[in-house]
Amino acid sequence: MAKRRKTTSGENVFVVATIVLCFLVTLGLSFAFSGDGFLNLAQVFAKSEERCFYLLAIGGYDDMTLARNTAELVKNRGGAGYVLKGEDGNGIEIIFAAYDDSDAADKVLATVEDRSAYLKTIIVKDSTLKWASGDVKTAVKDALCYFDIAFKTLYETSNSLNDNAVSLEEARTRIRVLSTQIGDIKSIFYSKTAGIDSREVTEINLALITALALLDNVEYSSVVKACSSMRYQIVQLVLCYQALLSNV
């Protein structure tokens, strides 16, 4: 799903138990004897069970060599330069950066000189974790926190480095600390799920290993290289997280 230069705003809903009850009763009365009403109600709650990420992209490339050459130019300016086989008729796409906030993504899109740039929405469905219970379910929830920790640190560090708010060495230290955090999460999850023969547990372990590998791949030869590399890893992190939650 791609969004082109159109500003949207998210909804921020605070629900109290009594309000929920009134809301359900009102909807129930309004949609009485209407099958569509209950379907729409289900869709309202379904929307709260997903997260959206926004990839700043340009598309329309048919030739992979040309796309990769353009991606290198993007990297040389601090962008992710991630080449993605496009969907929605966009051909091969080049990703500049990833965002978890639509307003932030829209602001950046508005400043891009290339008028063909757009926002590609990545929808991540929250897992119900029906396969897990008790201590295992708690361990899984704790392990899945790796993504938010990694995304936040990489995103903030790349932006701070780009704005000269931190030095290259400070950025390296932040990523080193992050790697230790993810490593600890991995170790704890492994110990709590040892002996459990489960495809889902294996998938989560692989996701944690992949996250550590992404952090190891961050380059520090220059500020521009570091910014680009971190943004590249963020894109991969989002896509891997999307795949993970679709499997667990």
Where are these regions (language model features)?
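Acidic/polar low-complexity segments and flexible, solvent-exposed patches
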Residues: 1-248
